[in-house]
Amino acid sequence: MASEDVKRTESAAVSTIVNLAEEAREGVKAPSYAFKSICKSLFAGGVAGGVSRTAVAPLERMKILLQVQNPHNIKYSGTVQGLKHIWRTEGLRGLFKGNGTNCARIVPNSAVKFFSYEQASNGILYMYRQRTGNENAQLTPLLRLGAGATAGIIAMSATYPMDMVRGRLTVQTANSPYQYRGIAHALATVLREEGPRALYRGWLPSVIGVVPYVGLNFSVYESLKDWLVKENPYGLVENNELTVVTRLTCGAIAGTVGQTIAYPLDVIRRRMQMVGWKDASAIVTGEGRSTASLEYTGMVDAFRKTVRHEGFGALYKGLVPNSVKVVPSIAIAFVTYEMVKDVLGVEFRISD
């Protein structure tokens, strides 16, 4: 009897341990799965950002050069002429100058942005359903705008110092008297000569521009997708899935709307980033004279001086290469993001 009691006790103990082990596995299964999904989502966002920016790097550099060009010492009269000039004077590498820094910035920026949007969307949707009492409620375009803007501000703020020095690296040429040797050297030089606040010059117009630019990109794209799936015009949807061409079109439309609304703020941001730089007076001026030092006391002052000395049209300098590059750039980013997530087996998407 004693031996049987011992066996029963041992059996019960083993059973208890097995049950505890099973419960432990079940307890960590969901968080572990969620963590893997998050990592895959971050990776997909990084790949999307890097691929899309590299594809349009020459147009991106041309846009920035036109935005900050000295109106009294015009070197680039247009997009085509500017690209030819860069090819002739700097070669193939000149067309991609600053792209390495841009990729170093855009990969974490895109990863954080896409991930933040998904988390913000889930949080906002949860609160919206709790408030309305409707468990089947979906995000409205306005709520998507809020989620997109939140994601954009978080991502932009986290990587802004890299964007600031990227702007200067992109603008400098082989003839610039003082050369930044790379992103690390540029960051160190700005910190030493201009102080840490200099790394966030132009941050305010960037934050303001995030709302219409990133917010509209996401909300327009997602709203178009939902409408197409629901209405299926011209048979564009197959098995409740959009084709790659349809996704590309949605991304292109979303990108065009966002960049058109926010573009003047982007011009002012770039000009403010040049303040305090030794080469700035040779690139762009704030007082309307080619030899004047570039000085803006803030965003409003930058707007005022730009319009006063160069006219309202100066706020749209570089719009042509930006329009050409932003459509494929945004479209490729969205499509690449979802395709990479499909390959990695991530179940939730931006639209979920």
Curated annotation (Swiss-Prot):
Q: Which GO terms describe its cellular component?
A: mitochondrial inner membrane
Sorted UniProt keywords:
Antiport, Membrane, Mitochondrion, Mitochondrion inner membrane, Repeat, Transmembrane, Transmembrane helix, Transport
* Alphabetized GO MF terms: antiporter activity
Gene3D superfamilies membership: Mitochondrial carrier domain (1.50.40.10)
- Where do the Solcar repeat units fall? 36-123, 139-227, 242-343
Q: Give TM regions.
A: 41-61, 100-120, 145-162, 202-221, 242-263, 324-340
Q: In which tissues is it expressed?
A: Expressed in seedling radicles and roots, vasculature of cotyledons, leaf primordia, leaves and sepals.
InterPro entries named among the record's database cross-references: Mit_carrier, Mitochondrial_sb/sol_carrier, Mt_carrier_dom_sf
Q: How is its activity regulated?
A: Inhibited by pyridoxal 5-phosphate, bathophenanthroline, mersalyl, p-hydroxymercuribenzoate and tannic acid.
Cysteine pairs bridged by disulfides in the record: none
Membrane topology label? Multi-pass membrane protein
Q: Which domain of life is it from?
A: Eukaryota
Keyword hit for Cell cycle: no
Q: What is the annotated role of this protein in its UniProt record?
A: Mitochondrial adenylate carrier that catalyzes specifically the transport of ATP, ADP and AMP by a counter-exchange mechanism across the inner mitochondrial membrane. Substrate preference in reconstituted proteoliposomes is ATP > AMP > ADP. May play a role in oxidative phosphorylation and be important for the provision of energy required to support growth in heterotrophic tissues.
Query: This protein is called what?
Result: Mitochondrial adenine nucleotide transporter ADNT1
The organism's lineage is: Eukaryota, Viridiplantae, Streptophyta, Embryophyta, Tracheophyta
